[in-house]
Amino acid sequence: MQRPLNGDGRFVQRLVVAVLLVMVMVGLIGGGAVQASGVRGRHVVFSPIHIPPASKINPNRPVLAFYYAWYSTSTWCACTMSDLPTIRYNSSYNATIARQVQWAANAGITGFINSWWGQGDPTDTNFGKLLAQSAALEQQTGYHFASTIYFESDAPALRGESNIVKQLRYLLSHYANDPHFFHWHGKPVLFFWNPLGNARTLAMWAAVRRQVDPNNATIWSAEGVDTSLLSVFDGIHLFSAGYWGILGGNMSAVDKGFRAKIDAYNKAHHTSKIWAAGVLPGYNDTKVPGRKGTYIVPRNNGATYRTSWSAALSSAPDWVTITTFNEWFEGAMIEPSVSYGNLYLNITQQFARQWHG
């Protein structure tokens, strides 16, 4: 995850992007599809939003996309991103959030995992707006869109046991009872990034949980591949979506391997730990300023994403997570882009329908 840097966020204005922007807006408002030529020569189709009936969504098979509410209109720059959105937006605008929720719902996504950097941060304020827009969507269409937060453990405000306890208490008291906060079997769900990074230990997290959630009234999903996390957390997820399996051509084996490890843990400990299989459209963080160890997972015009989805579903997951809806700095977004239009939302819709049954 790469949060925007402070600065002017300079970007080159391109005429073709302006034309695409107008076409997208017309497509959303008008009754027919609008066609435009993509920057890389692809033929892009932008269709009106159509929310599927609630009866078509299986609440026992959630699809949750990692989501970033930190952009301003000055953020967008081809110098720091491998692609650009069809609409350069401000994450704080209600119209932006409403549009993103509609796009996601149309694709069969059931909620966002909102990157969260602490009480009072814009990601906190915008999460409240996300819940409000989700309520508005359900009132208008009957579609239940329920989101949660991604506890960014490396964020300055979230470092150290005392800060973690304080912030989690705020989260649970402020949001957990909202009807559009993601619940699983009646319990609020939280996702945690990199729980064992920066000298954090399982013992520390166990102490945190005793203070914040002594009765295990919530569900905690940890990012990571180490099943020892399950001694404190209720499940694991892979923000990376197991990209090494994509590059190695054995993605299905990777996902099934994690399913088998969790099943073995559950059998040995008489638990019901959760496997959240991740899917990835591609990845490219080579333009992130100052980042070392960058890499690329090629998109292959949607083939990578389809392979990732097929592998995830073959592992009989409890949940499916998408990396990501809109992490533009790392090039892992499915949100409509200049290069691909709404290709990745369309692919999401196809596989989400299969998953929902």
What are these regions (language model features)?
Residues M1-V12:
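N-terminal secretory signal peptides that target proteins for export/translocation
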Residues V39-G357:
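Glycan-processing catalytic domains of CAZymes
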Residues I29-R40:
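Sec-dependent signal peptide cleavage junction
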Residues V12-Q13, N326:
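Residue-level micro-sites within transmembrane alpha helices that shape
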Residues F11, V26-G30, N58:
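Generic alpha-helix initiation/capping and coil-helix boundary signal
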Residues A18-G27:
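Bacterial N-terminal signal peptides
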Residues R14-L15, P62:
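Hydrophobic alpha-helical segments, especially transmembrane helices
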